C-alpha cells in the first residue's frame, strides 16, 4: 500500500480510497515483475584491476616529492609520522548513516577476487608497471630543516654560466667599435675637410671690367695695392690675383663685345633676384627697368617731417628747462 493511500483513508476520503483499492493489485504485479529481473555483475578486465591497484597505493614519485617537501619545511609545521603514514593505507569507506562498509560488501569482494585468478599480469610485481618516476628536482636545499634566509633553494647545477662576450663591443674604452667599412658620404666629408681646412670657398667669377681694374691699380700703385690687398678687396684668393696679373692675353674686339653682352645679361638676372627680395638696385640697373615692388618703397622709418617736428620739440624742451633753471 502506498503512503498516499493511507493518508487519504485517514482523512476520510472514501471515494479516493476505493480507486486506490482497484489500483493496488496492478502495482503489486509490477513490483513482482521487477523483482524477477536479474542484473549480471560487471566483470573487470586485468587493465582495470591494474589501475585500481595503482590508485590505492602511492607511487614512488609522490613519495619522493612528499619527503622532499617535509625535509624543507620548519619543524613547527611538522606533524607526527604516524599521522602522515595514515594516508598511504586505504581505509574502508563508511556511510554517514552507519551502514555497511566496503569490506563487508559481497559485491565489492567478488569484484576484487574474481580477476586475480585470471590475471595474465599476476607474475609481475607492482613496481614493474608502476608510473614513471618524477623528473629530478631542479632545486635542492642545504643541510638542515630550518628554512632560513641563508638556506634558500639554489640551482642544482651550481653557478650560472658566464655570458659570451660581444665581439662588436669595445671592452677597453666601453664604446661601440666603429664599422670596418665607411659610408661614401663619410669618406667624401673627410676628404673635403682635409683639402679645405678653412671651409669650402668656391672660386669667384670676376667681370672683364674687374680684371682690367685689378691690372690698372697694381700697375699704377704697386706699393699700395699689393696682391694680398687686392685679394681682400675683391674677395678672392691671392693665387687668383697672381694669375690675373701674370696673364698677357687680350681679347679681340668681337670677343670683347660678346663678353660685355654676356655679363650685361648676367647682371640683369642677378639684380632681378635681389629686387624681388627687397634690395634696391643701383641706378644703372634701375635705368634698365629693374626696380623692386612698390610695396618696398613705402617708408618704414621716420620721414623728414617727423624728424623736423621731433627736433622742434626737443628745442622747446631745452628752452623750458633753461628758463626754469634761471628762475629757480
Curated annotation (Swiss-Prot):
Its main location: mitochondrion. GO terms for cellular component: mitochondrion; nucleus. It is found in: Mitochondrion. Residues 301-320 have a biased composition (Basic and acidic residues). Residues 101-112 have a biased composition (Polar residues). Pfam families: Neugrin. Disulfide bonds: none annotated. Belongs to the RRG9 family. This is Required for respiratory growth protein 9, mitochondrial. It comes from Chaetomium globosum (strain ATCC 6205 / CBS 148.51 / DSM 1962 / NBRC 6347 / NRRL 1970). The gene is RRG9.
Amino acid at each position: 500500500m502506498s503512503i498516499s493511500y493511507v493518508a487519504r483513508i485517514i482523512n476520510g476520503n472514501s471515494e479516493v480510497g476505493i480507486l486506490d483499492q482497484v489500483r493496488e493489485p496492478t502495482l503489486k504485479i509490477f513490483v513482482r515483475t521487477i523483482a524477477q529481473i536479474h542484473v549480471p555483475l560487471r566483470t573487470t578486465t586485468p587493465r582495470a584491476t591494474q589501475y585500481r591497484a595503482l590508485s590505492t597505493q602511492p607511487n614512488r614519485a609522490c613519495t619522493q616529492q612528499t619527503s622532499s617537501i617535509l625535509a624543507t619545511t620548519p619543524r613547527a609545521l611538522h606533524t607526527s609520522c604516524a599521522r602522515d603514514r595514515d594516508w598511504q593505507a586505504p581505509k574502508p569507506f563508511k556511510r554517514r548513516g552507519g551502514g555497511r562498509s566496503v569490506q563487508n560488501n559481497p559485491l565489492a569482494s567478488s569484484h576484487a577476487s574474481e580477476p586475480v585468478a585470471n590475471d595474465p599480469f599476476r607474475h609481475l610485481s607492482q613496481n614493474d608497471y608502476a608510473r614513471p618516476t618524477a623528473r629530478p628536482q631542479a632545486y635542492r636545499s642545504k643541510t638542515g630543516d630550518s628554512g632560513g634566509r641563508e638556506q634558500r633553494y639554489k640551482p642544482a647545477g651550481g653557478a650560472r654560466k658566464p655570458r659570451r662576450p660581444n665581439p662588436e663591443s669595445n671592452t677597453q674604452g666601453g664604446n661601440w667599435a666603429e664599422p670596418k667599412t665607411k659610408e661614401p658620404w663619410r669618406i667624401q666629408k673627410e676628404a673635403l675637410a682635409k683639402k679645405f681646412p678653412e671651409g669650402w670657398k668656391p672660386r669667384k667669377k670676376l667681370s672683364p671690367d674687374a680684371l682690367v681694374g685689378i691690372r690698372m691699380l697694381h700697375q699704377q700703385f704697386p706699393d699700395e695695392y699689393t696682391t694680398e690687398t687686392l685679394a681682400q678687396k675683391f674677395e678672392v684668393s691671392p693665387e687668383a690675383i697672381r694669375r690675373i696679373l701674370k696673364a698677357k692675353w687680350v681679347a679681340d674686339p668681337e670677343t670683347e663685345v660678346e663678353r660685355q653682352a654676356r655679363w650685361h645679361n648676367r647682371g640683369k638676372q642677378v639684380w632681378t633676384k635681389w629686387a624681388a627680395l627687397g634690395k634696391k638696385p643701383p641706378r644703372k640697373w634701375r635705368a634698365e627697368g629693374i626696380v623692386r615692388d612698390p610695396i618696398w618703397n613705402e617708408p618704414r622709418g621716420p620721414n623728414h617731417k617727423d624728424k623736423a617736428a621731433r627736433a622742434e620739440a626737443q628745442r622747446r624742451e631745452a628752452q623750458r628747462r633753461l628758463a626754469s633753471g634761471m628762475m629757480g
